[in-house]
Amino acid sequence: MRGAARVGVTRRPRALAAGCMCMVALIGCGSQAGSAASTQRQAIERYMGEVEPIRLAVNKLLGGADPILEAFRDRRIAPREAARRMGQLERRFAAYAVDIAAVNPPTAQLRALNAPYADTYVFEDAYLSALVAGLADDELTHLPNTQAAQRAAITRWRIGLTVLARAADAPLPADLQRAGRGEIAPAPSPNGS
């Protein structure tokens, strides 16, 4: 009888210990999943902290192109003056293109999203450079048409970023959903031609 009592006593602590170990393992798995989401959230927040000031500054800067083009179309400024003003805008934009290319996202997923997004700045800079030359020559019929490629890349960036942010419960700027939906390149004439 003594041996039987001893066996029962030994089994209970072992069973209890095994149960506790299983609970600890399950809690650990849950905290790892939470930890991964938290890490991804922090990565997204860091990335947006770098990208958002550039994106907003570019939006504001490009808003300055329309008054230049309107004045050119209405012949309130000469072609050379329009080219000079647009050239100043293009040089400021080129600095932002360098800034966005210098962003180093902390995760592979964000790097994969950022590379094509940064390429849209290259397209825009090339367009602005061609626009400057076209304004100087008073000839705007041969500008590169990169809007569709830019729009698609920006839309893929926005959607990919939204998917990652939802999975990590990370906040995104409220106006981000408009990215890629408006006018991409300043139109040299009111009808876009």
Indicate where each model-derived feature is located:
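Short, solvent-exposed, charged loop/turn and helix-capping segments
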Residues: 90-118, 133-137, 164-172
